Amino acid sequence: MKPTRPFHQTPVITIDGPSASGKGTVAALVAASLGFHLLDSGALYRLAALASLRYGISGDDVDALVKLIDDLHITFREGLAQLDGVDVSAEIRAEEVGGRASAIAVHAPVRAALVARQRAFRKEPGLVADGRDMGTVIFQDAVLKVFMTASVEARAARRHKQLIQKGFSANIDDLLRDLRERDERDSQRVAAPLKPAADAKLLDTSALSVDQAVEQVVQWYEALVPHA
């Protein structure tokens, strides 16, 4: 049996990037390819928000929110977000849940509790974490940091295709405007602005398929950890 490595030596791959860059899909497939655990950091905030709504906890009851976050049973499998063993991937995308997530995130103790939960996903044999500040803030010692991007046109086209496939109406011009505005907000915010870590590898997926992007990340990891 292989000896257990110290917590800080358990390998982490971070995949950060802007909205609709495809980082969530790529992260899930990289984790599956390597047999690693998966963390969807954006979904974690929404899962906490959904749980607070279900249990009738006020968005301003900081102590109760922190305890709730500490006790949550959350898993991510094959791109699905599970709360207490039940898939809630669709529920956490509801507008009410998004609003609650933004409301509870203003409290510093709540953010600290969520950061601790994110770091607790670091378990053997390894972790793939996707988000916006995984490599710059949460896992600064990650063995591989990837910053995924794509042209705003490519990202809008992907989002448009996803929405149409799910039966929603979508306007490509509206999506382009929304993505540009979100990019500007994310890159200029004071706390953890969206930017690549200094030691991140840049992956532009504008002209890549999902499989090609996954293959590139796995190749980078295996080059860094040849006995993986």
From Swiss-Prot:
Binding-site residues for ATP, renumbered to this chain: 17-25
EC number of this enzyme: 2.7.4.25
GO CC annotations, alphabetized: cytoplasm
GO MF term list: ATP binding; CMP kinase activity; dCMP kinase activity
Recorded catalytic activity of this chain's protein: CMP + ATP = CDP + ADP; dCMP + ATP = dCDP + ADP
Keywords, alphabetical: ATP-binding, Cytoplasm, Kinase, Nucleotide-binding, Transferase
Name used for this protein in its record: Cytidylate kinase
Species name: Paraburkholderia phytofirmans (strain DSM 17436 / LMG 22146 / PsJN)
